[in-house]
Amino acid sequence: MTYRWILPMALLLCFSTTALSVNYDLLRSQLRSSNSACLMLLRQLNGAPQRCPEDTMNFQVPEEIEQAQQFQKEDAALVIYEMLQHTWRIFRRNFASTGWNETIVKNLLVEVHLQMDRLETNLEEIMEEESSTWGNTTILRLKKYYGRISQYLKAKKYSHCAWTVVQAEMLRNLAFLNGLTDYLQN
């Protein structure tokens, strides 16, 4: 009697697992589109690093991010999420001294948050399936990197020049994010 339910249950489990699995190609496409929007918004902010030559800074991007070569798609998703989260936090800080258009900054924050929302759903599934120790060291290095950016802004009292330097760094970050999205493939 119980045998006749085993096959339908097995098929149901198989199909539901397939239906629930992460569609990395769709995610990659969505993230690339949103990254392009963020890039456009960041470029609309009026900052020119040439005007602040004394305020240059090397924030020391983690090497595995700058020269990403061996990422598993699950690790890439986790790293992308972490980068977006810190980017979002940075742009929520005091940027009043910049003269930036608040609407542009708000739109940038919306785009970044939208990417985070898209990733959160997938990350929940990824985290259930595996635990990555590789990602932990990279995440720690990323936190230190973004900490240096935050400390720089604070030390410079959120000056226009400091924000201009950070804006240029965030433009670099978007290039790194685009490179990382290449690892999100089915």
UniProtKB/Swiss-Prot annotation:
GO biological process: adaptive immune response; B cell activation involved in immune response; defense response to virus; humoral immune response; natural killer cell activation involved in immune response; negative regulation of Lewy body formation; neuron cellular homeostasis; positive regulation of autophagy
Primary site of residence: secreted
CDD domains: IFab
Keyword Nucleotidyltransferase applies: no
InterPro entries: 4_helix_cytokine-like_core, Interferon_alpha/beta/delta
Keywords: Antiviral defense, Cytokine, Disulfide bond, Glycoprotein, Phosphoprotein, Secreted, Signal
Signal peptide: 1-21
Family matches, as SUPFAM superfamilies: 4-helical cytokines (SSF47266)
Disulfide bond entries: C52-C161
GO cellular component term, pick one: extracellular space
Subcellular locations according to the entry: Secreted
An example molecular function term from Gene Ontology annotations: cytokine activity
Residues annotated as glycosylated: N101, N136
In-chain residues carrying the UniProt-annotated modification Phosphotyrosine: Y24
Family: Belongs to the alpha/beta interferon family.
PANTHER family cross-referenced by the UniProt entry: INTERFERON BETA (PTHR11691:SF73), TYPE I INTERFERON (PTHR11691)
Complex formation: Monomer.
Stated role: Type I interferon cytokine that plays a key role in the innate immune response to infection, developing tumors and other inflammatory stimuli. Signals via binding to high-affinity (IFNAR2) and low-affinity (IFNAR1) heterodimeric receptor, activating the canonical Jak-STAT signaling pathway resulting in transcriptional activation or repression of interferon-regulated genes that encode the effectors of the interferon response, such as antiviral proteins, regulators of cell proliferation and differentiation, and immunoregulatory proteins.
Name of the protein described by the UniProt record: Interferon beta
Annotated organism of origin: Equus caballus (Horse)
